Amino acid sequence: MKKRSDAVFGVLLFLISMGFYLFFAFYDGAVICVDSPSYINMEISREPLYPMLLLLFRQVFSSAGEGYLQGVAIFQSILAACAALSLTCFLRKELKLGKAVSLVVLMIPLLTSLLCRFAAKRASMYSNSILTEGIATSLFLLFSRYLIDYCIKGKKKALFTAAFISFLLISTRKQMVITVLLLISAIVWRSIREKTVKKGLLILTVCVLGIGTGSYLLDCSYNYCVRGSFSRHANDDRFIDTVVIYASEKEDGEAIKRDDTRELFESIYEICDEGGYLMHSAGQGWYERSAHFGDYYDCIQIDTLWPALEQYVREHYEGDNASLEKIVDDYNAQIIVALMPDVFPRLMRVFADNVLNGMVTTVAKKTPVLVWYSVVVYILYIVLLITHVKRNGLDGRAILAVYTLLAVMINVAV
């Protein structure tokens, strides 16, 4: 009778998860965002996996024209539903959760998606947006499910599955290098706990080298097939350059030795300064500064820095797209290296502001009340965790709680 009841409840969870995501996939359709064309057009600045996914759907549904994007949205929604369901069912079985608690666990990713759709400025869900987040958020849930399984039981199959998903994530978004840091933390912790440090070091080396080598080869092979150049994607430095320019002052440009690079920096700086994009235009408190940085980050990078560098290089140099993008990267690197010594203290303030912001903000619109709410929640969370460990030891629930807190901290820091 209990098995039948559990089976019926499992079907209910499946229907809730799948029905939720597919409803919005059909109701909203495929959502095109600012970054979407760069993935659709397979631009060299993007990691390979998501453009490859779009290409696959474009080939399979070639007769549908732009309608293939709806197929992508449906696929991403099914992936999101399966990821949420997989994590819920794993935790229900492993932690012996009741039906009510299991339903709450399932609702967490669903309600987060609703916040993205109805409360966040973006006003759409990631699961049906043509963005890397469309698969990355779901893959991260699956990564967490298998890594937590490894942490609790030490199952090598779960670890290597998590490592493979980490490879997929890094090949989708460079920011997902956080999964490697979580993977390393888990292996080190299990090795110390089981007193198998040498074996753990070997496993750690295999996982990290496998992920790094695999992502490098996929990146280079993809660019060779698409552009005829066995090289990695370009423009990674633009993210650092954006923050460097945000924290800079005009006189910092004097440190740039090459005249053309210095003039290029000054032209970019003037546009950003006039638009109020830079750090000195922000408020005094960390909350105001982090809000200002978030509001104007894209204005610096997408609207100003990136177009200025691309236009300058294409006007003054000749060559194929891959070679021109390498020149763009060289200009980026020159600005970063020259300005970094002067802007570094300000850069650290930006970093600290955004770590604090990341610890308290949500996908909802910013409001100061979240700061105090988050302080109370973190304190309560840590107190409850310590109390639980004292009473029950480092059991499955404690491991899940520690993993969640560590994932948040690494995510906001990276």
Stretch-by-stretch model annotation:
Residues 5-33, 110-114, 209-222:
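Transmembrane signal-anchor helices characteristic of membrane glycosylation enzymes that use polyprenol
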Residues 159-173, 208-214, 219:
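Membrane-interface alpha helices of multi-pass inner-membrane proteins
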